[in-house]
Amino acid sequence: MKNLIIRHARQVVLVCKNGERILKGEALKNIAILEGSVNRGISVVADEFGKIECIGYDDDVEPQYNQCSFASEIDATGMCVLPGLIDGHTHPVWVGDRVHEFAMKLAGASYMDVHKAGGGINFTVEHVHKATEDELYEPLKQRLNRMLQCGTTLVEAKSGYGLNTENEMKMLKVIERAKKELPIEISSTFCGAHAIPRGSTAKQAADNIINEQIPTLVKAIKAGELDVENIDVFCEKGVFEVEETRVILQAGKDAGLAINFHGDELHPIKGAELGAELGARAISHLEEISEEGIKAMSKSSVIGVLLPTTAYILRLKPPPARAMIDAGVAIALGTDFNPNAYCLSMPLTMHLACCILRMSMTEALAGATINAAASLGRADTHGSLEVGKFADMVVINAERWEHLIYQIGGHDDIIQHVVKHGKVVFSKR
């Protein structure tokens, strides 16, 4: 028995059709789309292993499968099918309400003003330290399920509110539990260098991460207790500056983790250049990236993960997406979901990318699919609808795919089904 057949779709957005593992430059202008019509729809078949087995017009596909049974069937008449969305940057494990900080920001407080006043990351760290694993897991579960309903089928999830070995491991264990119990797929990131713990210096914090936290993490990975793929550092003036960032990231890389870090968010401190030098897989934020940083990224394979929600809520200068795209940098997108930017929706993030970062809709969709997959090292299996890739899909009740971005906050209404590995994991009632 096959897992699924989708029939009669008006449009199927493949994104890629020739096995591309990244889209940048001119390739972003013409993403692959299979167009149907009122009289000739499109079918997608997912095999028993959760992978795409066939995509084609109904009249070509039906004869091949008329003797087949399917665990699920979707009538997508008048609808569009897109790849499952991929969120390239989130901080979803936390407790402690920070809604009061929103009023501070609206009154003119900067990110660092809030941080210095005892809010921000340190506020959340205090609450995470007091919480049990169960107390962290329940809100994480709710958030991830809401992301799934917004069309996200793969999400990057960071630790980073522990800032010591015990609590960073606690957060990573909670993420590991979510991987096993929830349908959404997760790429785990160790972010012990998210802030400098109170009473510590940057050097002391870096030494602790390198000599205690990373070895403990490696031991847990080797024991099969954790599956962590990436290492992150908040590379920022007054937090972990370039030299501390360098040694932490190198230690993580030496331990087998992919480099995927915060860079050049608030100040231009050459984070992009550092990432290119170290062979980073991805660098996030980049609001203050320099021209030299753009050049360095364009010459390397490092992906820029842009977070329009951050510029929006903090009223920051947005990252120079157009200059980066024009220079040949591959751009992915993320919600940056965290207590400072409470956004769970990749459709809204794509909308903001278009309006604030001046990206086109095809650029935004590539950033939320194939390029986001590449930022997590999964472009071989995720991020486009091609035979042999995982059948992760979003079915929307619209005849054109652009409605997923165009309708501001409209994803709750138009997302009809979310499919993960060929299984329907969400359907609108």
From Swiss-Prot:
Catalyses which reaction(s): 4-imidazolone-5-propanoate + H2O = N-formimidoyl-L-glutamate
Any one cellular-component term (Gene Ontology): cytoplasm
Gene name, Swiss-Prot/TrEMBL: amdhd1
Cofactor: binding comment: Binds 1 zinc or iron ion per subunit.
Family under the similarity heading: Belongs to the metallo-dependent hydrolases superfamily. HutI family.
Residues reported in the UniProt entry to bind 4-imidazolone-5-propanoate: 161, 194, 265
Chain sites annotated for binding N-formimidoyl-L-glutamate: 161, 338
Organism: Nematostella vectensis (Starlet sea anemone)
InterPro entries assigned: Amidohydro-rel, HutI, Metal-dep_hydrolase_composite, Metal_Hydrolase
Record protein name field: Probable imidazolonepropionase
